[in-house]
Amino acid sequence: MVQMSGFQIESFLQTPRYAVFATNSIDGPPQLTTVWFLYESNVLYVGIERSSVKYRNLSRNPGVSMCIDGEHPDGHTVVVYGEAEFMETGTPDFDGILWRLTRRYHDSDEDARG
């Protein structure tokens, strides 16, 4: 497979796609979840609930991996490794990012609010 350029990766990440988000479980294999993501200013944002296994895993070990798959027939894939950081809920930054993350996967503002 041909490696994408930085410009191609930036463009690829601007398209709403599903990502497989992996956290490190406490006593076994990685915990994998399909997630929505938002890419802005060289940062990937993923929304998770405080009650989720992902949150508990990340609280203990912030290491993450993501695999963002392209649609066939292009076959492109972007794989990312890094450390998660939590954002405080209820702040203007958090609310804006959460809205943009949600909105990008819906056809209209009304659908996103639904």
Question: Where does each model-flagged region fall?
Answer:
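Charged, gly/pro-rich active-site loop segments
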Residues: 1-4, 76-114
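Residues at secondary-structure transition points
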Residues: 4-7, 49, 53, 73, ...
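Short loop/turn and capping residues at structural boundaries
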Residues: 69-70, 113
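Short amphipathic alpha-helical segments and helix-helix/interface helices
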Residues: 9-10, 55, 98
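Extreme N-terminal tail/first-helix region
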Residues: 1-18, 74
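Short beta-strand segments
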Residues: 16-50, 56-58, 64-69, 77-79
